[in-house]
């Protein structure tokens, strides 16, 4: 067995040895008054673990069947990490940040996107993030639904497979000492019946989580002078953010009417970052965007591939027809999206599988380009998953007081959402109606999209924004695109269409995880949305509800993509960043690994795309297009 020792090498033995977290110590327990039976256990995190502000790490714990109006016949332990504002925690608003997936833990938000810290170059410690969102807001990161990230149902010793992200029972068939891609540790049960299985069920859980935390978590609730709550999310968060906040709004109305016991939540802002919101509005863009509708001159699929995908999308019984069939059956037999009707689940899962394979698959399987960045190889090293190795360190687990390993992504959650076909479904009325209802209730909605993302690309998202039928929709659609300035350079970093409380922003030179690519731009957009400013300049604060951007009806700014980044195989992000030959070498113990990076072997020739033809002209003309389907 060949294993090369290098300076500061992390070989295959250390990740295995780091598997079982230490038993948490010095936890504080709060008995919930908001929901009898629920508890909060937490501890203050030492400064330096992530940032230098006061922060608290802990769990909101629900015994079986204790949540209000939520299917939950199993224990739920939801992990949170709360960072106080750097200015005045008592008066600054609260922003909840959740990642998508489904099954993506929110620690990527902490260490890669909006949190107070970034990973150091050697991935062994952290450095301050100068663009942290807690400059003027309290930040709450939540791993949800249960069995995502640090959240768990029942602590279970198991083996995690980095190749597939699948948990398996401990035993001779899953022996980390014989396979370097396996990690023995403590996780949730891996039981797909013990988590939320649809967006709406996750919303039901989340409402209970926020009810308990906002009322009972004393470091936040005591002496609170500002009770505004905002929710920001990305990717699958295009469904989570509007779906959750619309459900909160519905529950608020029921509480006000005396139909439900609970606290009215002061809903302020919904932020959607590169979110997949509505398939009917967005799916076709997954054909157009890589063909000729991106602004970087990249033609990632050829004419034959384009024709094949378009046929699969539009033919009788094709992708669009199957989406519509799923919606019709779900509306009739499972309108409240409990995910318990087999016929609906089957039809919706089938539609999801067909559209993924026959439409998205033309690009995903053929272009060798990034799912999250069309300008990069599919073995995209950015942003790095090195924070996962940091969270596996015993001293970090002790500081956070976590009894479980961090699972990201959670195959269990991803699988059960796929079984119900949740991605194809929409909740009652759809997520477009969720956004409309929130806007009509005077909740701000900010849609923010990096323009190099494929999977939830800005072209489809623009269609979503123009398809939201709310009271002020005509004024939003009439608004033009304005340049977005976020520093003193005089160079615009984005373009925005905004009318009043609703904005759609396209951010240049950014992929799916926009905040990792353009952190300063992302922070400014967040700050301006949260504090009732115009997104373009941050200078308009008066009568913002009547403000409209002026400019061209289409966002046509184009530029060449930045140079590609060479693929980097990261042990902790093996499934997405490593080629087959590298994974095989890790599995056999024949890889050289330095600070979690596989330095040998390199990926096999042909893994990344060779230069492809570009198109001189692309999709927009000078006339307003009709985006409404």
UniProtKB/Swiss-Prot annotation:
EC number(s) reported in the record: 3.4.16.5
GO biological process terms held by the UniProt record: proteolysis
Enzyme class: hydrolase
InterPro entries membership: AB_hydrolase_fold, Peptidase_S10
Active site positions, chain numbering: 235, 453
Signal sequence interval, chain numbering: 1-18
The UniProt record lists the keyword Repressor: no
Residues bearing attached sugar chains per UniProt: 157, 197, 405, 418, 463, 554
Catalyzed reaction equations: Release of a C-terminal amino acid with broad specificity
Biological role: Involved in degradation of small peptides.
Name this protein carries in UniProt: Carboxypeptidase Y homolog ARB_06361
Organism: Arthroderma benhamiae (strain ATCC MYA-4681 / CBS 112371) (Trichophyton mentagrophytes)
């Amino acid at each position: 067995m060949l294993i090369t020792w290098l300076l500061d090498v992390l070989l295959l033995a250390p990740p295995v040895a780091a598997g079982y977290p230490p038993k948490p110590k010095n936890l504080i327990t709060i008995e919930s008054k908001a929901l009898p039976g629920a508890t909060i256990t937490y501890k203050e995190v030492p400064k330096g673990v992530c940032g230098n502000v006061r922060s608290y790490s802990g769990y909101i714990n629900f015994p079986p069947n204790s949540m209000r109006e939520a299917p939950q016949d199993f224990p739920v332990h939801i992990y949170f990490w709360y960072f106080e504002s750097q200015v005045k925690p008592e008066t600054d608003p609260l922003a909840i940040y959740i990642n998508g997936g489904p099954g993506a833990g929110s620690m990527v938000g902490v260490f890669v996107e909006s949190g107070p810290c970034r990973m150091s170059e050697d991935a062994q410690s952290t450095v301050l993030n100068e663009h942290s969102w807690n400059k003027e807001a309290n930040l709450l990161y939540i791993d949800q639904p249960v069995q995502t990230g640090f959240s768990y149902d029942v602590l279970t010793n198991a083996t995690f497979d980095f190749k597939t992200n699948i948990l398996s029972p401990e035993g001779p068939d899953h022996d980390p000492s014989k396979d370097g891609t396996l990690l023995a540790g403590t996780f949730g049960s891996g039981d797909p019946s013990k988590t939320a299985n649809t967006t709406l069920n996750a919303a039901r859980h989340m409402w209970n989580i926020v009810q308990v935390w906002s009322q009972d978590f004393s470091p936040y609730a005591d002496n609170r002078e500002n009770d505004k709550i905002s929710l920001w999310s990305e990717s699958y968060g295009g469904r989570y953010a509007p779906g959750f906040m619309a459900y909160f709004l519905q529950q608020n109305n029921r509480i006000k009417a005396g139909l439900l016991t609970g606290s009215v939540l002061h809903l302020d802002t919904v932020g959607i970052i590169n979110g997949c919101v509505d398939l009917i509005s967005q799916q076709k863009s997954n054909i157009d965007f890589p063909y000729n509708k991106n602004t970087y001159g990249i033609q990632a699929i050829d004419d034959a591939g384009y024709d094949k995908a378009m046929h699969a999308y539009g033919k009788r019984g094709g992708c669009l027809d199957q989406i519509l069939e799923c919606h019709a059956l779900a509306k009739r037999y499972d309108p409240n999206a409990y995910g318990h009707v087999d016929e609906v689940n089957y039809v919706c899962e089938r539609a999801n599988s067909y559209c993924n394979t026959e439409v998205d698959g033309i690009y995903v399987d053929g272009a060798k380009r990034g799912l999250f960045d069309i300008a990069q190889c599919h073995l995209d090293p950015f942003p790095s998953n090195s924070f996962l190795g940091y969270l596996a360190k015993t001293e970090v687990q002790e500081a956070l007081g976590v009894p479980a390993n961090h699972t990201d992504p959670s195959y269990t959650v991803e699988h059960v959402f796929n079984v119900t076909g949740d991605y194809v479904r929409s909740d009652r009325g759809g997520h477009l109606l969720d956004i409309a209802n929130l806007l009509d209730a005077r909740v701000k909605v900010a849609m923010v999209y990096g323009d190099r993302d494929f999977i939830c690309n800005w072209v489809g998202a623009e269609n979503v924004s123009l398809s939201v039928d709310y009271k002020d929709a005509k004024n939003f659609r009439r608004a033009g695109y304005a340049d977005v300035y976020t520093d003193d350079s005089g160079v615009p970093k984005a373009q925005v269409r905004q009318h009043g409380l609703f904005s759609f922003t396209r951010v240049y030179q950014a992929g799916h995880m926009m905040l990792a690519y353009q952190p300063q731009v992302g922070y400014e957009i967040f700050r301006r949305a949260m504090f009732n400013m115009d997104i373009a300049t941050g200078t308009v604060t008066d009568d913002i509800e009547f403000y409209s951007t002026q400019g061209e009806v289409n966002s046509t700014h184009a530029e060449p993509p930045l140079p590609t980044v060479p693929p980097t195989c990261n042990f902790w992000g093996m499934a997405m960043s490593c080629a087959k030959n590298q994974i095989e070498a890790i599995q056999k113990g024949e890889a050289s690994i330095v600070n979690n990076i596989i330095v040998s072997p390199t990926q096999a020739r042909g893994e990344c795309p060779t230069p492809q033809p570009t198109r001189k002209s692309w999709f927009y003309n000078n006339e307003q297009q009709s985006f409404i389907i």
